């Protein structure tokens, strides 16, 4: 509906005053900046997870939380996101609050460790100030904080071992996210917080699991992913990897409660070939007949491991299949986990916790 000339004139004067006071672009019509409507993303390294996220990856200019039990693949997933950002020509930073970063394994996940920025802060405030400085530089595309549980407030480090300091870490996270959220949006960086699980005492109904660092991160995160190891992969008696399931328990950019499964192998991280096979079969791009896998009339291999090996040896074919999958993915039905069936941390609608 068109505005009356008087209202249009008053609105133009108000917008002009706001621009003069706070800078050009402080207020704008969305129709004038249609390019900002598109959601920019960085792929996760797992095509199944890219589909589950609904937009093809983790959204830029947002806070993302990845949480799960120990050895579930949190750091591996974050390192694959870093690798994808670097492939796109981006700069990534890894804030290693746990002091457990393994550059050899990161390189196996595809990370260019020579150009990766790494910081091992002494306490939580230092870690978050470094994160803020990197974000405000507008030069970094991905910042990973590993992990929230290891962001120990300075007062706790300088105090005695038995001191009780309730709520200190939660207040630290709340203040940091208030300062960071605007800067993250303007810089178009993805800030990924890895988090651990704790058990709440005395919970009779629902999941007793909760994440560390208080409630603030749950609200500020646009995407929250629960990652779990569901199966151990073996070659005879030797363990070679794990089958992993990721549930998108909160998503502000697409419908939530979707899930993805993929293999994490000890020598390569997320198995790209295995993921392409699984999703290709689900979308009928790859045909499975008995033990054989086919692309059209061409055989890829007998058995999943042989087909994976064939794709690893023919990266151009793997790229073509991935392109076909991405072209068809948004129109394909994706399994959605009901919030009642979800055994993850209590969470999350589309827009609110």
Swiss-Prot record:
GO terms for biological process: DNA recombination; DNA repair; SOS response. Keywords: ATP-binding, Cytoplasm, DNA damage, DNA recombination, DNA repair, DNA-binding, Nucleotide-binding, SOS response. ATP binds at residues 68-75. Pfam families: RecA, RecA_C. It is found in: Cytoplasm. Transmembrane segments: none annotated. InterPro entries: AAA+_ATPase (IPR003593), DNA_recomb/repair_RecA (IPR013765), DNA_recomb/repair_RecA_CS (IPR020584), P-loop_NTPase (IPR027417), RecA-like_C (IPR049261), RecA-like_N (IPR049428), RecA_ATP-bd (IPR020588), RecA_C_sf (IPR023400). One of its GO terms (cellular component) is cytosol. The keyword ATP-binding applies. The keyword NAD does not apply. One of its GO terms (molecular function) is ATP hydrolysis activity. Can catalyze the hydrolysis of ATP in the presence of single-stranded DNA, the ATP-dependent uptake of single-stranded DNA by duplex DNA, and the ATP-dependent hybridization of homologous single-stranded DNAs. It interacts with LexA causing its activation and leading to its autocatalytic cleavage. HAMAP family: RecA. Belongs to the RecA family. This is Protein RecA. It comes from Roseiflexus sp. (strain RS-1). The gene is recA.
